[in-house]
Amino acid sequence: MILRSLLYFVMAGLCEIGGGYLVWLWIREGKSVWLALVRAILLTVYGFVATLQPANFGRAYAAYGGIFIILSIIWGWQVDNVVVDRLDWLGAAIALVGVLVMMYANRA
């Protein structure tokens, strides 16, 4: 269940970040307006994938925020060639701990 939930978070994150990045390319870098169509599809898929989480809405979206932080840093580093420093990674690690506690800690 944990692995599936993490997979849903990653899928949702890639769709949301990818969709946002396409808007960035279109508006800020003058790329084709057709990117807006792909963006709309990705952001729609993001909204759907998020509903697959077993947790309630508030917990799932709060935890997703931590995953979004991590994926955004990785996206910037790998796709946009941004230099990521140790404080970026530290912040991402702290966010990940929060995600793990919120989503997967044993609630007795």
UniProtKB/Swiss-Prot annotation:
GO terms for CC? plasma membrane
The topology of this chain with respect to the membrane is: Multi-pass membrane protein
> What keywords does the record list, in alphabetical order?
Cell inner membrane, Cell membrane, Membrane, Transmembrane, Transmembrane helix
One Pfam family hit:
UPF0060
Task: Report the family membership.
Answer: Belongs to the UPF0060 family.
Q: What is this protein called?
A: UPF0060 membrane protein sll0793
Superkingdom of origin organism:
Bacteria
TM segment ranges: 7-27, 32-52, 64-84, 86-106
Record-linked InterPro entries: UPF0060
Give the UniProt subcellular location, in the record's own words: Cell inner membrane
Q: Note the PANTHER family from the entry.
A: UPF0060 MEMBRANE PROTEIN YNFA
Q: Does the keyword Transmembrane helix apply?
A: yes
Q: Which organism is this entry from?
A: Synechocystis sp. (strain ATCC 27184 / PCC 6803 / Kazusa)
